[in-house]
Amino acid sequence: MSAASDTARRGIMLVVSSPSGAGKTTLTRNLLAQEQNISLSISVTTRARRPSEIDGVHYHFIAMPEFTAMRDGGGLLEWAEVHGNCYGTPRKPVEAALAAGHDMLFDIDWQGTRQLYQAMRQDIVSVFVLPPSAAELKTRLERRAEDSADIIARRLRNAIEEIAHWTEYDHVLINDDLDRSFATLRQILADGRRKSAQRADLADFIAKLLTDLRRIAA
C-alpha cells in the first residue's frame, strides 16, 4: 500500500466546543493563523448585520425565507434558533471543501455538534475545551470586562449543562496552559489528517483488491 498522501486525502471537520471563558476562541484563532489548509466554517444567520461585521466574513446574512428554504431542503448541516434569530451551517461549501482535501473548523456548541454527528460523523474530529477549575473560569470571565455580573452568572450556569456533554467528544482538552493546549490541539489536527490520508489509501487498496477478486472468482 502506498504511503499516505495529504493531497489525496479527504478533508476533516475539526469541531471545537467549550463553555464561555475556557479559551476556545483564542485557541481556534491561533490555529487558523498558524495552520494551512484549514478554514473557519462561516454560518448563515437571519439576524441583522452589526456595523463592524462583513457579510461573507463573519456570517452570511440572509432573510428568513431563504433560511427556511435551506433548512427544509437539506441545505444546512446544523441549525439553531437563538433569541429569535436563526443560525446554520451551509452544507454545500463544507462538502466541497472536504472533497477537495481542505479542512474545516467549526466553533459550535454541543447541540450543533450533535447535529453535525448525525450528518457527517465519519468526517469529524471533535474537541471539548475545559477550564482548569470553576474558580479560574469565573476569573477569566470577569477579566474580560465585557459582561455584566448578571451575564457572567448566566454563563457560569450555562457552563454546568455544557460541560455535562464532554463525553460526547473525541478529545477533551484541559486549558490550564495556553501554549501547551495549543500544541495539543495542533497534534489532534495532525492526527486527524493522517488518519484521513490513511483511509484514502486504504480505500484505493480495497477497491483494487475487490476488482482483482471479482476477476479471479469469475
Enumerate the language-model features and the residues they cover.
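Extreme N-terminal, non-catalytic leader segments
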Residues: 1-13, 36
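Conserved lysine of the Walker
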Residues: 24
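NTP-dependent small-molecule kinase module
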Residues: 2-4, 146-147, 161-218
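Short glycine-/polar-rich loops that comprise or flank the Walker A/P-loop
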Residues: 36-38, 120-125, 167-169
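P-loop (Walker A) phosphate-binding loop of NTP-binding proteins
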Residues: 17-19
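Short beta-strand-centered segment that lines the nucleotide-binding/catalytic pocket of NTP-utilizing
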Residues: 36-49
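Post-Walker A alpha-helix
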Residues: 27-28
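ATP-dependent NMP and nucleoside kinases share a basic, alpha-helical "lid"
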Residues: 65-75, 89-146, 163
